[in-house]
């Protein structure tokens, strides 16, 4: 680790006062989504650590999507469970480069083609792996609410595949030694995709019939808003995960570490720098909110309401990410430089050790 910093507070991050949203009070989706994964063989239903892992992942949707009903939460939860399992699984020590590439190609194709994928088409159901089965469950859950909006399903699958094709480049970018680091500009480009905000926001394209035209998702103003929101979330998440990433030899994947090396500044000075960057990102989002509504003012009321819904959803995710990150045990660490995430939590589950090596 770089020089040991004094304890700082994450309260320095700026969030507009009007960006205040209650957590979703529905929780049934957590157990139901976990049970689906158990049926597929992803988890052992009798193992408390397995449920603790899943719960730590799935409760994020109650923060990200405060207005969702149960069925919409089930869509979001299936996505999040699949994403976290795949990401954590690919980080396992036994996963060689070849195995990682195979998994990425395989699950991309299953999402696109389902049971017709050449990876599965010749196999009996009993021969499918746990991750094969759960990917089919996810695909079915995505298709159900969007069966009459196939373009939105395609948009969302595009966001998912962009995300999981970014996993390996991010790992490779840090170099062969844990003290190596990628140039900040390269890191920012890859991490903007890898943070996953495009698919987290894109959940709305399948779970909610917003009535917006499919072309909205490539509107350059909207894309810029999501990019700035991703920047804010990257910075905040890199702060809360700083100690854990340093401890796991992932320093080269953290903007705080990269900037300490690049700028030759103390941790405290770098923290001030990134907090200001995050604040400016919020300001850019707010400016583009106004611009987006103005440029789309010609839309009929129903579609404009959908646009405004998505604008508010982006805010909810930015704020929800903060609130979830501060309550999940995933980021608690003895060496955290931040008051809010420092400590030893007995409920912490070592997620990188939970998953069975035969999932794929």
Curated annotation (Swiss-Prot):
Chain positions of motif DDxx(x)D/E motif: 87-92
Chain ranges for the short sequence motif NDxxSxxxD/E motif as given in the UniProt record: 237-245
Enzyme class, spelled out: lyase
Pfam families (UniProt xref): Terpene_syn_C_2
Keywords on record: Lyase, Metal-binding
Coiled coil: none
The keyword Metal-binding belongs to this UniProt entry's keyword annotation: yes
Catalytic activity, EC: 4.2.3.-
A GO BP entry: terpene biosynthetic process
Taxonomic superkingdom: Eukaryota
GO molecular-function terms, A-Z: metal ion binding; sesquiterpene synthase activity; terpene synthase activity
Entry similarity comment: Belongs to the terpene synthase family.
Function in brief: Terpene synthase that converts its substrate farnesyl diphosphate (FPP) into 2 yet unidentified sesquiterpenes.
Domain notes from UniProt: Contains several highly conserved motifs that are important for catalytic activity including the aspartate-rich 'DDxx(x)D/E' motif and the 'NDxxSxxxD/E' motif, both of which are involved in complexing metal ions to coordinate the binding of the isoprenyl diphosphate substrate in the active site.
Protein name (database record): Terpene synthase 5
Species of the source: Dictyostelium purpureum (Slime mold)
Underlying gene: TPS5
